[in-house]
């Protein structure tokens, strides 16, 4: 972006100056509305989410057999919700800032099949596509036992079709493993940030991995192009997919059930704050949408991004959405949080969700490494750097009197609050790689 344009952007949006300086930044969204006001802009409804629930239930018998690690939950891919009191104390000590309320962790990092939040959206979209093809071919009805999809005739049928996706790693992992299991030919276009072990794991499942020297945006574009030339190839579009988004949104109702099981209350007197790491936006956007449908105006969602890849904060704050990238303002999009290394946010998610999100913040790679180490020490839970992005959120909220006033929170409401950090990945990181992460914390 040329200087004059940049200066006028900063004049209009002074916060951009802090982003450019790679400062850890927090922006509480003045444009938040109630669910009732914000919902029409999403373009999706509660019924769409119910349909996704139903589809995943139809596939549960198949998943339970195809992936024995899901058998215990009857083929439902869901993660644990745990309290992390020792980590809460450690954060308070390290940052000299109390966290009022209780700190919880949602362990999507340990979801079965692919060990990340992408096991929600990625797997769902592959299943939805497989179902559509099988229904259209007359090989399946909605009332069938879907475990029949494991038979050789279905494998044969699906092998005529292929799937392509662009990814920094975790989405590719979930889509690759699922597609290969069903019988699709699958190609994952991986950006320069993708970890070597993720590529190796995909190849071990018979997935074709195409590697790029450039970032996520290029990998997605190339994947899109390659798929266009083949009528039997379906491209999963992480930047714009409503199907992926709905796969993530199912998490809302499920979390509500987990809260009920644990006797946790969410209402006006007991607010819920949720902190979601954000790359291109589909995962956190879908989850936040589901949470809003489940808990209404009593849940407050925040997106967390690396200082080097603040694409969603930049897009929503300036109102330019996918018309601006972090590279346009001179930020390099290079971060240890490979899952969040995205320079241009999803325009669909930004426009759909900007009224339903309470805020956005950035944190440095070093902060992620520090918290990664503390969590391993205090709670024995090991995550990848991206998954710690949410962990900085509770203190930003508790430290901001202006945010608390904007929403009229009393001291008592904050004492009764639940702070939920969404851990997005790390359950399948190889030991030696994890040791390198741990060595970088202070």
Swiss-Prot record:
Its EC number is 4.3.1.18. It catalyses: D-serine = pyruvate + NH4(+). Its cofactor is pyridoxal 5'-phosphate. Gene3D superfamilies: 3.40.50.1100. One of its GO terms (molecular function) is D-serine ammonia-lyase activity. CDD domains: D-Ser-dehyd (cd06447). PROSITE patterns: DEHYDRATASE_SER_THR. Keywords: Lyase, Pyridoxal phosphate. One of its GO terms (biological process) is D-serine catabolic process. SUPFAM superfamilies: Tryptophan synthase beta subunit-like PLP-dependent enzymes. Monomer. This is D-serine dehydratase. It comes from Escherichia coli O139:H28 (strain E24377A / ETEC).
């Amino acid at each position: 972006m040329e200087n004059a344009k940049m200066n006028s952007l900063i004049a209009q949006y002074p916060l951009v100056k802090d982003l450019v300086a790679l400062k850890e930044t927090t922006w509480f969204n003045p444009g938040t509305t109630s669910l009732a006001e914000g919902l029409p802009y999403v373009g999706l409804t509660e019924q769409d989410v119910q349909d996704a629930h139903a589809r995943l239930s139809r596939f549960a018998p198949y998943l339970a057999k195809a992936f024995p690690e899901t058998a215990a939950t009857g083929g439902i891919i869901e993660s644990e919700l745990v309290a992390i009191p020792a980590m809460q104390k450690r954060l308070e000590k390290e940052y000299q800032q109390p966290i009022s309320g209780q700190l919880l962790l949602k362990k999507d990092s340990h979801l079965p099949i692919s060990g990340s939040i992408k096991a929600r959206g990625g797997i769902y979209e592959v299943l939805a596509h497989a179902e559509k093809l099988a229904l259209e071919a007359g090989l399946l009805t909605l009332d069938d036992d879907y475990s029949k999809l494991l038979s050789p005739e279905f494998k044969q049928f699906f092998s005529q079709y292929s799937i392509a996706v662009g990814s920094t790693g975790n989405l590719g992992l979930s889509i690759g493993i699922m597609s290969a299991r069903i019988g699709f030919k699958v190609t994952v276009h991986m950006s320069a940030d993708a970890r070597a072990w993720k590529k190796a794991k995909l190849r071990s499942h018979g997935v074709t991995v195409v590697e790029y020297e450039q970032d996520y945006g290029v990998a997605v574009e190339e994947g899109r192009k390659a798929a266009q030339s083949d009528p039997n190839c379906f491209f999963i579009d992480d930047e714009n997919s409503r199907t992926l988004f709905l796969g993530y949104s199912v998490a809302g109702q499920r979390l509500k059930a987990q809260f009920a099981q644990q006797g946790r209350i969410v209402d006006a007197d007991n607010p819920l704050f949720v902190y979601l790491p954000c790359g291109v936006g589909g995962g956190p956007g879908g989850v936040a949408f589901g949470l809003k449908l489940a808990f209404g105006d009593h849940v407050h969602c925040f997106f967390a991004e690396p200082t080097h890849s603040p694409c969603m904060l930049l897009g929503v704050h300036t109102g330019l959405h996918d018309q601006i990238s972090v590279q346009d303002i001179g930020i390099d999009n290079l971060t240890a949080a490979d899952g969040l290394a995205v320079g241009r946010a999803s325009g669909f998610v930004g426009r759909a969700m900007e009224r339903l999100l309470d805020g956005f913040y950035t944190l440095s790679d070093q902060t992620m490494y520090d918290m990664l180490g503390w969590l391993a020490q205090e709670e024995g839970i090991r995550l990848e750097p991206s998954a710690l992005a949410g962990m900085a959120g509770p203190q930003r909220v508790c430290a901001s009197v202006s945010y608390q006033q904007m929403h009229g929170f009393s001291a008592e409401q904050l004492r009764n609050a639940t702070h939920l950090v969404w851990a997005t990945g790390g359950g399948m990181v190889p030991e030696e790689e994890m040791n390198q992460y741990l060595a970088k914390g202070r």
